[in-house]
Amino acid sequence: MEIHEHIIELPKKVYVGNGILSKLRDYLFQLNVLEPVLVVTGPNVRKIVIDEVAKGLNEIGKIEFIEVLDSSIDEVNRVEEKAKQLNPKFVLGIGGGKTIDVAKYVAYKLNVNFISIPTAPSHDGITSPFASIKGLGKPVSVKAKMPYAIIADINVLSSAPRRLINSGIGDTIGKLVAVRDWKLASKLTGEYYGDYTASLALLSAKHALSCTRIIHRDLKYSVSLLTEALISSGVAMGMAGSTRPASGSEHLFAHAVDLLQPNAALHGELVGMGSIIMAYIHGINWREIRNALDRIGAPTTAKQLGIPNDVIIKALTIAHTIRPERYTILGDRGLTWASAEKVARDTGVIE
């Protein structure tokens, strides 16, 4: 078998633990972080977190903060303009997935180091070298900067709204489908498939399933497990050089729903729901996925999210067009309306 060259991107350091944000100053010195530093935050980042970060940065030198409202290209352009004035050596992203997406995309465009400090374990974008930016003409991830370092404080992450934590679990469970799609594409189209990378993504999904069994009795341990799973998923993408190990037909469905009814649900909620349907089509244990999501109170039906049945069916019929170059169980032609309605009803996603 001919092996083609590809570059593996990995973080230099990953820090995970309870209360570790108080050690930020030490970590930044270990990482040789130099001024000036641009810190990108979001509107929902708690003041206590911002204050802790500011304290950790106060000996670095010139620091500037900027708050972003969403992960749109307009916000990217605004942050990039600020960055060009500052000419930072490092960009820090502090917040949820949207904030970190903007920070790492700007860091990528300017080719400067990026440090991820997530405050919500809502999806694997907090650790991956890809970003979901709205307004680029396609609802899929684009190349961004692999984090130079990740600083994940479990105390901070476990205090995030439960819905965001559940979203992260849904996003990670989706790897069960994504890897199946990747393997299928390799078999039918000859696409590169990495066994080790796929195994890493599957391990992340298995950890997420474990989270659903223990989260009610031990939130912090469960969030720690989820965080490590999200980090592993991001590393898998860095090793593969694409989102393939972490994004398949379940993500295409999620993007399709978001196109038809923007902001109807969190990304991980739609991925979780899509995973139920796509697992059914693959012929794997879709009930295990549905039961796992039910256990934590994550949505498993369109009704729970206020999404009309027709939107779900339409999304299933157009999902294969979102990334036509990415072969999945949906094939080249996708699902007919009748087939889409049947799988959605059979899995209980619509009534």
Curated annotation (Swiss-Prot):
It catalyses: sn-glycerol 1-phosphate + NAD(+) = dihydroxyacetone phosphate + NADH + H(+); sn-glycerol 1-phosphate + NADP(+) = dihydroxyacetone phosphate + NADPH + H(+). One of its GO terms (molecular function) is metal ion binding. One of its GO terms (cellular component) is cytoplasm. Zn(2+) binds at D171, H251, H267. Pathway: Membrane lipid metabolism; glycerophospholipid metabolism. Binds 1 zinc ion per subunit. SUPFAM superfamilies: Dehydroquinate synthase-like. Substrate binds at D124, D171, H255. The keyword Lipid biosynthesis applies. Its main location: cytoplasm. Coiled coil: none annotated. One of its GO terms (biological process) is glycerophospholipid metabolic process. Keywords: Cytoplasm, Lipid biosynthesis, Lipid metabolism, Metal-binding, NAD, NADP, Oxidoreductase, Phospholipid biosynthesis, Phospholipid metabolism, Zinc. NAD(+) binds at G97, K98, T99, I100, D101, T119, A120, P121, S122, S128. Its EC number is 1.1.1.261. Its cofactor is Zn(2+). InterPro entries: G1P_dehydrogenase_arc (IPR023002), G1PDH (IPR032837), Glycerol_DH (IPR016205). The keyword Cell cycle does not apply. It is found in: Cytoplasm. PANTHER family: GLYCEROL DEHYDROGENASE (PTHR43616), GLYCEROL DEHYDROGENASE 1 (PTHR43616:SF5). Homodimer. Catalyzes the NAD(P)H-dependent reduction of dihydroxyacetonephosphate (DHAP or glycerone phosphate) to glycerol 1-phosphate (G1P). The G1P thus generated is used as the glycerophosphate backbone of phospholipids in the cellular membranes of Archaea. Belongs to the glycerol-1-phosphate dehydrogenase family. This is Glycerol-1-phosphate dehydrogenase [NAD(P)+]. It comes from Metallosphaera sedula (strain ATCC 51363 / DSM 5348 / JCM 9185 / NBRC 15509 / TH2). The gene is egsA.
